């Protein structure tokens, strides 16, 4: 999966964000298994970038929830 920018994430609905998080977590788990079994990662920075993307999505979801509560 490509890196998602904050502006791209903001355009998604909450349900789409949840789907992206699930997809990214599966990808992260697959990379983690590959790493733990001693395999060489296809892209060494992919694990950390995937974690950052998940955090970015969760942050924007919280922003949307807070915005909905205040409105």
Curated annotation (Swiss-Prot):
It comes from the Archaea. GO terms for cellular component: ribonucleoprotein complex; ribosome. Residues 32-51 are annotated as: Disordered. Keywords: Ribonucleoprotein, Ribosomal protein. GO terms for biological process: translation. GO terms for molecular function: structural constituent of ribosome. PROSITE patterns: RIBOSOMAL_L29. The keyword Ribosomal protein applies. InterPro entries: Ribosomal_uL29, Ribosomal_uL29_CS, Ribosomal_uL29_sf. HAMAP family: Ribosomal_uL29. This is Large ribosomal subunit protein uL29. The lineage of its organism: Archaea, Methanobacteriati, Methanobacteriota, Methanomada group, Methanococci.
